[in-house]
Amino acid sequence: MFMTYQPKKRQRKKEHGFRKRMKTSSGRNILRKRRQKGRKRLTA
């Protein structure tokens, strides 16, 4: 067995980053909800 989480900064940004969220309407909804909730960090 090996560790399943192999962190990569670039991949994380690409998948869960701000620009990716802004591209889709559902992504923008996520950002809106997180702003509403008062999250300190909106995205990865």
From Swiss-Prot:
Coiled coil: none annotated. The keyword Ribosomal protein applies. GO terms for cellular component: ribonucleoprotein complex; ribosome. One of its GO terms (biological process) is translation. GO terms for molecular function: structural constituent of ribosome. It holds the Pfam family Ribosomal_L34. InterPro entries: Ribosomal_bL34, Ribosomal_bL34_CS. Keywords: Ribonucleoprotein, Ribosomal protein. Residues 7-23, 30-44 have a biased composition (Basic residues). HAMAP family: Ribosomal_bL34 (MF_00391). Belongs to the bacterial ribosomal protein bL34 family. This is Large ribosomal subunit protein bL34. It comes from Clostridium botulinum (strain Hall / ATCC 3502 / NCTC 13319 / Type A). The gene is rpmH.
